[in-house]
């Protein structure tokens, strides 16, 4: 941020909504400093009201940023510049004094566990980008709460942005507006600054009326100063700073300091036919089915799944030793392709109104369309692709971008959990890790202990996804599904997880690993997935209660024969689904050991080294 300026600045920007005098002093100072730096024409303090939202949506429609989808109620479509479609790991940095605070120093090459930038380089980058970057535009002031307003687990942020798309999306994804300022008072807040980096008048014409500045895109986190600064991208993960930037990168660092966990996890409630309920949290990399699992329709009669959150969990042990979790978000920012009545009926019901779609295709009758939507088109209805061109299946390219999104209010989900906004959070009894593994990894196994479970999280690997800019089908290490989101050194993060076992009175959740994606020799999935995954959750539920049978294997406990309820399923090759090959696991543990030794190096906790050795030994005795 620029040098602290005197209070009561003579701002050239005109305040068009709200009043500077109504702001807490620290918020006002933050706003004035950055208005001086970015030089917007107008300042708009967001109140979060319906009326304000309607006005902004109408304004974006006039400017061609959004199109109204007339088939649904208050739904909108944004098509971005094709250069601004995903999170960009290579341009996302954490700024600390010492590199080792941010990433372990790897043995060879570059760290894959985050990108560090020095304070000097960041100051240069800031000064090359932000002065005058909002000329001709409005600076919106967004007061937002991550988590239910007033929950002891919640945190408040203020985002300054020149993008009305960000304002409308943040209103869905967070609790936003005047009530947040009232709750904040003189309290602490995370300072978020965002600009699309396109001052007016424009130097070159926009693509799709979507302002962005891909050449200069930078997303920076300054954990010591509680600041997030993002430039040049309008895409959700880079511009909705409450999401990954605050709720994971910044929050994981706060959690380390304050003794809690901020994780890339869904939270679901599952109730058995007897009416007993448990809450589980699950970490999968992006596009591995977190949203589908969180909103599952169980195929097992009498079982019920309810959704607390589909992406992020903030968890803290309470005085009784229960791990309590809240969903810090207020909406779902879900990947659209592959979402259908078959794969996720509850998501389809959620997105029928008050939803902003980005980079999906549009039908000529004012609806949305994407790969895997599985809905026949009415005769005569045509499709316009996310590239704004007439589209037909013969074109040989997808109609929707693989990372196209829906941004929709969580309260609209038909199976939202009754306690989803409970200020004290819900008690987590099981933690699930998982990834997309076509070979070698069984459908489900249970960790042998908390320490072993932390190792299982550290060893997570998955086929690459569309949510980041990587292409192709390679198996990537994605520890805890947090690889793109660590806010500090991953070795210290592992030590923090291990330290939870020292918490007095802690009732440690059981830890499981799942793989819905194992394939047979013909390349067909061995497990039907989706609602049938409730059968795996049933086994976990009963394991937590000490009821279900399990068989000890070198990698953990797997269901005993007949312990997994397969009633009503066609033929399932259980042998192949649960087979554990010595050859595969020798290679797997070698890859994991090499990765952790290389990437975490001197910061790898000795408990994790012990788990690697113990696993090697168990495999050698197979």
Swiss-Prot record:
Alphabetical list of InterPro entries matching this protein: PEP_carboxykin_GTP_CS, PEP_carboxykinase_C, PEP_carboxykinase_GTP, PEP_carboxykinase_GTP_C, PEP_carboxykinase_GTP_N, PEP_carboxykinase_N
Q: Which GO terms describe its molecular function?
A: GTP binding; manganese ion binding; phosphoenolpyruvate carboxykinase (GTP) activity; protein serine kinase activity (using GTP as donor)
Reactions this protein catalyses: oxaloacetate + GTP = phosphoenolpyruvate + GDP + CO2; L-seryl-[protein] + GTP = O-phospho-L-seryl-[protein] + GDP + H(+)
Query: Which annotated residues bind GTP?
Result: 287-292, 405, 436, 530-533
Activity modulation notes = Phosphoenolpyruvate carboxykinase activity is regulated by acetylation and glucose levels. The anaplerotic conversion of phosphoenolpyruvate to oxaloacetate is improved by PCK1 acetylation on Lys-91 (K91ac), Lys-473 (K473ac) and Lys-521 (K521ac). High glucose concentrations favor PCK1 anaplerotic activity by triggering acetylation on Lys-91 (K91ac). At low glucose levels, SIRT1-mediated deacetylation of Lys-91 promotes the cataplerotic conversion of oxaloacetate to phosphoenolpyruvate.
In which residues is Mn(2+) bound? 244, 264, 311
Q: Which residues carry this modification: N6-acetyllysine?
A: 70-71, 91, 473, 521, 524, 594
Q: Which residues carry this modification: Phosphoserine?
A: 19, 90, 118, 286
**Residues bearing Phosphothreonine?**
178
For this protein, what post-translational modification is recorded in UniProt?
Acetylated. Lysine acetylation by p300/EP300 is increased on high glucose conditions. Lysine acetylation promotes ubiquitination by UBR5. Acetylation is enhanced in the presence of BAG6. Deacetylated by SIRT2. Deacetylation of Lys-91 is carried out by SIRT1 and depends on PCK1 phosphorylation levels.
Residues forming the catalytic site: 288
Q: Which GO terms describe its biological process?
A: cellular response to dexamethasone stimulus; cellular response to glucose stimulus; cellular response to insulin stimulus; gluconeogenesis; glycerol biosynthetic process from pyruvate; hepatocyte differentiation; oxaloacetate metabolic process; peptidyl-serine phosphorylation
Task: Please give the superkingdom of this protein's source.
Answer: Eukaryota
List keywords of the entry alphabetically.
Answer: Acetylation, Cytoplasm, Decarboxylase, Endoplasmic reticulum, Gluconeogenesis, GTP-binding, Kinase, Lyase, Manganese, Metal-binding, Nucleotide-binding, Phosphoprotein, Transferase, Ubl conjugation
Per the record, its GO cellular-component terms are:
cytosol; endoplasmic reticulum
Q: In which pathway does it act?
A: Carbohydrate biosynthesis; gluconeogenesis
- Give EC number(s), comma-separated: 4.1.1.32, 2.7.11.-
Q: Which cofactor does it need?
A: Mn(2+)
SUPFAM superfamilies the record matches: PEP carboxykinase N-terminal domain, PEP carboxykinase-like
Please describe the quaternary structure of this protein: Monomer.
Further comment found in the protein's record: In eukaryotes there are two isozymes: a cytoplasmic one and a mitochondrial one.
Family, according to the entry, reads as follows: Belongs to the phosphoenolpyruvate carboxykinase [GTP] family.
Protein known as: Phosphoenolpyruvate carboxykinase, cytosolic [GTP]
Name the source organism.
Answer: Pongo abelii (Sumatran orangutan)
Organism lineage reads as:
Eukaryota, Metazoa, Chordata, Craniata, Vertebrata
The gene it comes from is PCK1
């Amino acid at each position: 941020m620029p040098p602290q300026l005197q209070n009561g600045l003579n701002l050239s920007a005109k305040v068009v909504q709200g009043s500077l005098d109504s702001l807490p002093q620290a918020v006002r100072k933050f706003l004035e400093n950055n208005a001086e730096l970015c030089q917007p024409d107008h300042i708009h303090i967001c109140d979060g009201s319906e009326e304000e939202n309607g006005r902004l949506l109408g304004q974006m429609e006039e400017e061609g940023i959004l199109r109204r989808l007339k088939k649904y109620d208050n739904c909108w479509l944004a098509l971005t510049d094709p250069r601004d479609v995903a999170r960009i790991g290579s341009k996302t940095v954490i700024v600390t004094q010492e590199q080792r605070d941010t990433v372990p120093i790897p043995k060879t090459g570059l760290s894959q566990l985050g990108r560090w930038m020095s304070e000097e380089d960041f100051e240069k980058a800031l000064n090359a980008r932000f002065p005058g970057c909002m000329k001709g535009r409005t600076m919106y002031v967004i007061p937002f709460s991550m988590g239910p307003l007033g929950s002891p687990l919640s945190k408040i942020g203020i985002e300054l942005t020149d993008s009305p798309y960000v304002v409308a999306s943040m209103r869905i994804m967070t609790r936003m507006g005047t009530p947040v300022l009232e709750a904040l008072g003189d309290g602490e807040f995370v300072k978020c600054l965002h600009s699309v980096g396109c001052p007016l008048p424009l130097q070159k014409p926009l693509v799709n009326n979507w302002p962005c500045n891909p050449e200069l895109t930078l997303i920076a986190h300054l954990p010591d100063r509680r600041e997030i600064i993002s430039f040049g991208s309008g895409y959700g993960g880079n511009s909705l700073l409450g999401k990954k930037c605050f709720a994971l990168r910044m929050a994981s660092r706060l959690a380390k300091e304050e003794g809690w966990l901020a994780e890339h996890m869904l939270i679901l409630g599952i109730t058995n036919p007897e009416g007993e309920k448990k809450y589980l949290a699950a970490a999968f990399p992006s596009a591995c089915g977190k949203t589908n699992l969180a909103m599952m329709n169980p195929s097992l009669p009498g079982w019920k799944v309810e959704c607390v959150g589909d992406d992020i969990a903030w968890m803290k042990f309470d005085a009784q030793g229960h791990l309590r979790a809240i969903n810090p978000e207020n909406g779902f920012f879900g990947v659209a392709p592959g979402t259908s009545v078959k794969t996720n009926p509850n998501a389809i019901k959620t997105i029928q109104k008050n939803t902003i779609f980005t980079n999906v295709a549009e039908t000529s009758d004012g609806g949305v369309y994407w790969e895997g939507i599985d809905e026949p088109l009415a005769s005569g209805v045509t499709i316009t692709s996310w590239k704004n061109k007439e589209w037909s299946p013969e074109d040989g390219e997808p109609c929707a971008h693989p990372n196209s999104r829906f941004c929709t209010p969580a309260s609209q989900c038909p199976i939202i959990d009754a306690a989803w906004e409970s200020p004290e959070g819900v008690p987590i009894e099981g933690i699930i890790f998982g990834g997309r593994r076509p070979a070698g990894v069984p459908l489900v196994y249970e960790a042998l202990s908390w320490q072993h479970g932390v190792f299982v999280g550290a060893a997570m690997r998955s086929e690459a996804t569309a949510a980041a800019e990587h292409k192709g089908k390679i198996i990537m290490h994605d520890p805890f599904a947090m690889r793109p989101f660590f806010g500090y050194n991953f070795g210290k993060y592992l030590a923090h997880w291990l330290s939870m076992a020292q918490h007095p009175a802690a009732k440690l959740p059981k830890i499981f690993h799942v793989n819905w994606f194992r394939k047979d020799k013909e390349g067909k999935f061995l497990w039907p997935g989706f609602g049938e995954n409730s059968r795996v959750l049933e086994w976990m539920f009963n394991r937590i209660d000490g009821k279900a049978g399990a068989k000890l294997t070198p990698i953990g406990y797997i269901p005993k024969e007949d312990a997994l309820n397969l009633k009503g399923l066609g033929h399932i090759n259980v042998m192949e689904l649960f087979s554990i090959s010595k050859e595969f696991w020798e290679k797997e543990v070698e890859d994991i050991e090499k990765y952790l030794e290389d990437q975490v190096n001197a910061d790898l906790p000795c408990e994790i080294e012990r788990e690697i050795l113990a696993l090697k030994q168990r495999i050698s005795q197979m």
